Amino acid sequence: MDPETCPCPTGGSCTCSDKCKCKGCKCTNCKKSCCSCCPAGCEKCAKDCVCKGEEGAKAEAEKCSCCQ
């Protein structure tokens, strides 16, 4: 997947950072970082959210800085 493209499979458009890979993005509008760790219903997902931890970590919601 092209990090430059950063598609959102479930809708909307992502404007991601250079290193964004946007895997499984559920955000409607992602800014700076497109968070695969954000749950679909996270209202703050589009607001400078940062994913913490490794892929496949326990609770994904706990990894997402915008969903605390």
Curated annotation (Swiss-Prot):
Region of interest called Alpha, as start-end residue ranges on this chain: 31-68
Keywords: Acetylation, Copper, Metal-binding, Metal-thiolate cluster, Phosphoprotein, Zinc
Gene3D superfamilies: Metallothionein Isoform II
Record's keyword annotation contains Cell wall biogenesis/degradation: no
MF term (GO), any: metal ion sequestering activity
Location of the region described as Beta in the Swiss-Prot/TrEMBL record: 1-30
Binding site for a divalent metal cation 7: C51, C64, C66, C67
Modified residue annotations for Phosphoserine: S33
Residues reported in the UniProt entry to bind a divalent metal cation 6: C38, C42, C45, C67
Amino-acid positions noted as binding a divalent metal cation 1 in the UniProt annotation, renumbered to this chain: C6, C8, C22, C25
Family assignment from sequence similarity: Belongs to the metallothionein superfamily. Type 1 family.
Protein name in the entry: Metallothionein-3
Organism: Mus musculus
